[in-house]
Design a protein with these regions (language model features):
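Domain-level signature for proteins that mediate thiol-based redox and metal-cofactor handling
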Residues: 1-132
Length: 132
């Protein structure tokens, strides 16, 4: 296993429940059983807080850790664009990730393609929460 993935997954500062959330969703990976609950607080079309709880593998934990820390103070439209890029990443022959989101290059690469569903679970949960 990649030590970089473990290091990213160990950042759990947003592993919390937001009591006064404005958006919330739970999503489960039917293939492996990973489960992700996302709670978001959105004000003036901007994500101002992001909390998650998960019972999942380290790849899913690394993905949600990066997504949560990168999403705070970003406009919902920007997150929507990121979701589109990431969801098409593996299908589009590993398309380049926009500069604004280059931090995701740490986990989205061809060596992790076998863990695609684990990496995408947090993105699907956010999409569900925001009804995108």
């Amino acid at each position: 296993m990649d030590l970089k993935i473990l290091q990213i997954a160990s950042n759990t500062e947003n592993n919390k429940v937001i009591k006064d959330h404005t958006h919330k969703a739970t999503h489960k990976n039917a293939i492996c059983g990973d489960k992700m609950e996302i709670s978001l607080k959105v004000k003036e079309n901007k994500i101002v807080d992001f909390g998650y709880q998960c019972k999942s593998c380290v790849y899913c934990q690394a993905s949600v850790s990066l997504l949560s820390s990168s999403s705070i103070n970003k406009p919902v439209e920007s997150i929507k664009n990121l979701l589109n890029v990431i969801e098409n990443f593996f299908e589009d022959n590993l398309t380049n990730i926009p500069k604004e989101w280059k931090i995701f290059k740490k986990i989205f690469d061809k060596k992790n393609i076998a863990r695609k569903d684990c990496l995408l679970l947090p993105f699907k949960a956010v999409s569900k929460a925001l009804k995108l």
